[in-house]
From Swiss-Prot:
Protein name: Phospho-N-acetylmuramoyl-pentapeptide-transferase
TM annotation in the entry: 7-27, 28-48, 82-102, 103-123, 147-167, 179-199, 203-223, 229-249, 256-276, 337-357
Location of the protein in the cell: Cell inner membrane
Gene field: mraY
Lipid bilayer topology: Multi-pass membrane protein
PANTHER family with a match to the protein in the record: PHOSPHO-N-ACETYLMURAMOYL-PENTAPEPTIDE-TRANSFERASE, PHOSPHO-N-ACETYLMURAMOYL-PENTAPEPTIDE-TRANSFERASE HOMOLOG
Organism: Prochlorococcus marinus subsp. pastoris (strain CCMP1986 / NIES-2087 / MED4)
An annotated GO cellular component: plasma membrane
Catalysed reactions, as listed in the record: UDP-N-acetyl-alpha-D-muramoyl-L-alanyl-gamma-D-glutamyl-meso-2,6-diaminopimeloyl-D-alanyl-D-alanine + di-trans,octa-cis-undecaprenyl phosphate = di-trans,octa-cis-undecaprenyl diphospho-N-acetyl-alpha-D-muramoyl-L-alanyl-D-glutamyl-meso-2,6-diaminopimeloyl-D-alanyl-D-alanine + UMP
Pfam family, one: MraY_sig1
Organism lineage: Bacteria, Bacillati, Cyanobacteriota, Cyanophyceae, Synechococcales
Any one GO biological process: cell division
Length: 359
């Protein structure tokens, strides 16, 4: 990324872009609370990350880089990890505070799902550090735990009438999914959690995209105009702010990584809010970066297995997946890849909101 006079989308420009957009939103929705929540959340995350990553470093909670990854990443070894703590703990505290003022089963469900995935991510990171290699929980163990939590969340959400088979496309258009809504919810929760986790492979990529997506989700919820859902819009803006504050120290070159503690949980929180607010259609658009990252891995693995079975030698579609590594091996600088992914994500937010308003 160029330094000096540049049009690059840096951390500072991304921050002010979101702030300006939030000011516009505050004017449109007549609520200064929106901008206040975002700024306060950003400041909280910024401060606790600034001092927290030093504590994590002293505790030797350091990242192990997988040997199969790009060789350029080997110099990231021993970077403090598990920084997602500084995003998720304030978020959980916020939910507890909100629950004191808002009598909503949905807030409790969101808290349950967030803290459960947080525990999975924390355990995965801890085992990875303890084993001194980039391998914590086994993939089948992690998926089983995620699936169990997702099923419990869906059952309780359904019993509390938060799951509606009529997926809202726009204010005037609903799509009846019938019982298919349940696997959709499962894929949204588990799939998005793992998709954000896969995206967290470059400095600032997952944190920046998460900040943008939560911003878009918050805006979509406000556009719905349902008073009982407004609180989830405010919560989404708060999470966007928390991710931005963390991004200050996670951007290239990263002083701290969020780890699975952060990425798995952020994806789960994003999926949970989308389920509780019936925001599937918009989520599918604004989460395009996360979905693309996950699909690139699925395509790569499937194509390799099929070609190996047919030709006795597996072939690859991409140089390496997730797809951000493909661009790295193409010779594009890490910070440039992240910058371009942020830009694409912002365009997806605009597209999602425009479609929401005009369909």
């Amino acid at each position: 990324m160029m330094i000096g006079k540049t049009r690059s989308l840096t951390f500072t420009s991304l921050f002010f872009l979101l702030v300006i957009s939030l000011i516009v939103n505050s004017y449109i929705f007549n609520s200064l609370l929106i901008i206040n929540i975002f700024l306060i959340s950003s400041l909280i995350s910024l401060v606790i990350t600034k001092y927290g990553f030093k504590i994590i470093s002293r505790l030797n909670l350091l990242q192990n880089i997988r040997s199969e990854g790009p060789s350029l990443h080997f110099n990231k070894t021993n970077t403090p990890t598990m920084g997602g703590i500084f995003i998720i703990l304030p978020f959980l505290l916020l939910l507890l505070i909100v629950n004191n003022y808002v009598d909503s089963v949905g807030i409790l469900l969101l808290f349950f799902c967030t803290i459960s995935f947080f525990i999975i991510g924390f355990l995965d990171d801890y085992l990875s550090i303890a084993n001194k290699k980039n391998a914590g929980l086994k993939s089948n163990e992690k998926f089983t735990l995620q699936a169990l939590i997702a099923v419990l969340f869906i059952i309780f959400a359904s019993q509390s009438n938060y799951i509606n088979p009529l997926i809202t496309i726009s204010n005037n258009w609903n799509m009846d999914t019938n019982i298919v809504i349940f696997p959709i919810c499962f894929l949204t929760l588990v799939g998005l959690s793992n998709a954000v986790n896969l995206t967290d492979g470059l400095d600032g990529l997952a944190a920046g995209c998460s900040a943008i997506v939560f911003f878009g989700l918050g805006t979509e919820i406000f556009i719905k105009g349902q008073k009982d859902l407004i609180i989830y819009g405010l919560i989404s803006y708060a999470m966007s702010g928390l991710c931005i504050g963390f991004l200050k120290y996670n951007k290239y070159p990263a002083k701290i990584f969020m780890g699975d503690t952060g990425s798995l949980t952020i994806g789960a929180a994003l999926g949970s809010i989308s389920i509780l607010t019936n925001s599937f259609f918009t989520l599918f658009i604004i989460s395009g970066i996360f979905i693309t990252e996950a699909l690139s891995v699925m395509i790569q693995v499937s194509f390799f297995k099929i070609t190996k079975k047919l030709f006795k030698k597996g072939k690859r579609v991409f140089l390496m997946t997730p797809i951000h590594h493909h661009f790295e091996l193409k010779g594009i600088k890490e910070e440039k890849i992240v910058e371009n992914f942020w830009k694409v994500n912002i365009l997806l937010i605009v597209l999602g909101i425009v479609l929401k308003i005009n369909l």
